[in-house]
């Protein structure tokens, strides 16, 4: 392609008269280009510029005064002349400097081009030689392979760079999440400690007020006795001034009263506090907090199920709160309501606010057999608690009469075995943790930092398990706590 282009340029820059590169090229009206000297020296050239002459190539007549020098073509001719000054450079490069033969072979050991004479020389005897074209082709193939491999490596580098960027973002997100988790955890611990501090200070204030009230009462009583004694003393001193007759006539009464009067000592008040503050077990609190945080990871957000709602139960607009109302003249003993979700596998957790209620029951229920209960409690009919047994599909705890906490276990008779656990902190918020695979139902005192209330083990969930709630006839609301509340 390059040689063809060069040939075309040479044709356009060659004078058709002298067959040499154009010198002071002139462009004729017919389009041909000739040297100025060739045009003037032609036998048909005319000295008088007003006369007409003809093109030496095609014979077209033209006036000499209209001729113009082609400067662009002159520049091209000048550059082409520089190239033609060394016409044998490319040829010499293809010839052996020692023998003048064409370099048609390639020596693998010396890695250079050689001619056929070099191949037979002592210098290259025993060397591996190939045709120049084959060596070039092999070299190009090797270059292509290397290029392909490097491009693949480059792609790997780009992929690794992208992975590193992604890892950096991922780590930043993980670190940020962990930072927030740590800050949240310690903020919660600080709130717990603040709450414990306020509770201890409140207890101390109450004890202080009780002791001060007792001391104030004792002080008032002593003041009364002191006043009475002063009056008696004053009366006796006054009587000493009386006459003998007056003294003897009225002496028996005042003496008798003075003799029988004795000081009534006030009730002794302890000089020591009933309870000395002890720093809370931070490790135990932290462990309970960690356990609570762990189960809260399985929080299920659901509502009360409005289907088949008993007439004496009223749901809030968002179905997260249930309230019991009385239906005269009947007293309901089956106020149960289920959650809007059921569970057959996995781990699930929810929390219930019962802070205002004096009676409630909550936990997990699964259908084991058909149980029929009359919503009207007639005379002689057992109360609604007798059905709360695991063998009937109930794993529940509850509160009765505002202070009696109950856990309902299986028994050999109709009524369940009722356990009454000691609860140091009243249950205002209860957490329920269901583990279907382990077959356990755990109840946590969220009010007391997540301490365990009770855990049912070896639970059999042959049917889907439902969250269960019973507000009883207590009018205070029972509320499902929203996530992260």
Swiss-Prot record:
Where found, per UniProt?
A: Cytoplasm; Mitochondrion
Q: What happens when the gene is disrupted?
A: Trim34a- and TRIM34b-deficient mice show an impaired integrity of the inner mucus layer.
Q: What is this protein called?
A: E3 ubiquitin-protein ligase TRIM34A
GO cellular component annotations of the record: mitochondrion
One GO MF annotation is: zinc ion binding
Stored Pfam families: SPRY, zf-B_box, zf-RING_UBOX
What the record says about family reads: Belongs to the TRIM/RBCC family.
- Pathway(s): Protein modification; protein ubiquitination
The keyword Transcription regulation belongs to this UniProt entry's keyword annotation: no
Tell me what reaction this enzyme catalyses: S-ubiquitinyl-[E2 ubiquitin-conjugating enzyme]-L-cysteine + [acceptor protein]-L-lysine = [E2 ubiquitin-conjugating enzyme]-L-cysteine + N(6)-ubiquitinyl-[acceptor protein]-L-lysine
Coiled coil stretches, renumbered: 136-170
What are the boundaries of the RING-type zinc fingers?
Answer: 15-59
Per its UniProt record, what Gene3D superfamilies does this chain match? 2.60.120.920, Classic Zinc Finger, Zinc/RING finger domain, C3HC4 (zinc finger)
Sites binding Zn(2+) sit at: 96, 99, 118, 124
At the top of the EC hierarchy, this enzyme's class is transferase
Q: What binding partners and quaternary form does the record give? A: Homotrimer. Interacts (via B-box and SPRY domain) with TRIM5.
EC number(s) per entry = 2.3.2.27
- Primary location group: cytoplasm
Stretches annotated zinc finger (B box-type): 91-132
The UniProt keywords, alphabetically, are: Antiviral defense, Coiled coil, Cytoplasm, Metal-binding, Mitochondrion, Transferase, Zinc, Zinc-finger
| Organism expressing this protein natively | Mus musculus (Mouse)
Where the record annotates domain B30.2/SPRY, the positions are: 282-485
């Amino acid at each position: 392609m390059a040689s063809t282009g060069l040939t075309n340029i040479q044709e356009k820059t060659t004078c058709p008269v002298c067959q040499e590169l154009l010198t002071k090229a002139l462009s004729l009206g017919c389009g041909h280009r000739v040297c100025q000297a060739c045009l003037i020296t032609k036998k048909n050239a005319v000295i008088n510029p007003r006369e007409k002459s003809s093109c030496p190539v095609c014979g077209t007549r033209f006036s000499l005064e209209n001729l113009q020098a082609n400067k662009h073509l002159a520049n091209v001719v000048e550059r082409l002349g520089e190239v033609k000054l060394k016409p044998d450079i490319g040829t010499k490069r293809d010839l052996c400097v020692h023998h003048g033969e064409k370099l048609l072979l390639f020596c693998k050991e010396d890695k250079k081009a050689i001619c056929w004479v070099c191949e037979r020389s002592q210098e290259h005897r025993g060397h591996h030689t190939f045709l120049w074209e084959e060596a070039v082709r092999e070299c190009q193939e090797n270059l292509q392979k290397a290029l392909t491999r490097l491009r693949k490596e480059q792609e790997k580098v780009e992929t690794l760079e992208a992975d590193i960027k992604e890892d950096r973002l991922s780590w930043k997100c993980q670190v940020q999440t962990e930072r927030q988790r740590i800050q949240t955890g310690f903020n919660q611990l600080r709130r717990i400690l603040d709450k414990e501090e306020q509770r201890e200070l409140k207890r101390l204030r109450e004890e202080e007020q009780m002791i001060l009230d007792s001391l104030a009462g004792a002080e008032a009583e002593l003041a009364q006795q002191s006043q009475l004694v002063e009056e008696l003393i004053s009366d006796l001193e006054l009587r000493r001034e009386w006459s003998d007759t007056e003294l003897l006539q009225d002496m028996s009464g005042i003496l008798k009263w003075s003799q029988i009067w004795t000081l009534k000592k006030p009730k002794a008040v302890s000089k020591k506090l009933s309870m000395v503050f002890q720093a809370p077990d931070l490790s135990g609190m932290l462990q309970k907090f960690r356990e609570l945080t762990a189960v809260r990871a399985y929080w299920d957000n659901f509502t009360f199920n409005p289907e088949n709602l008993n007439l004496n139960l009223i749901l809030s607009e968002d179905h997260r709160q249930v309230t019991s109302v009385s239906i005269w003249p009947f007293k309901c003993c089956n106020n149960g309501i289920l959650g809007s979700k059921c569970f057959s596998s996995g781990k699930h957790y929810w929390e219930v606010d019962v802070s205002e209620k004096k009676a409630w029951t909550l936990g997990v229920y699964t259908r084991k057999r058909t149980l029929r209960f009359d919503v009207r409690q007639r005379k002689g009919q057992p109360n609604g608690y007798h059905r709360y047994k695991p063998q009937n599909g109930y794993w529940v705890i509850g509160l009765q009469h505002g202070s009696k906490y109950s856990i309902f276990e299986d028994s050999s008779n109709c009524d369940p075995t009722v356990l009454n656990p000691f609860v140091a902190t009243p249950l205002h918020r209860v957490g329920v943790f269901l583990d279907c695979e382990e077959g356990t139902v755990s109840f946590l005192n969220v009010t007391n930092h997540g301490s365990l209330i009770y855990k049912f083990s070896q639970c059999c969930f042959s049917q889907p398990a439902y969250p269960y709630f019973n507000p009883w006839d207590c009018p205070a609301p029972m509320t499902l706590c929203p996530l992260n509340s």
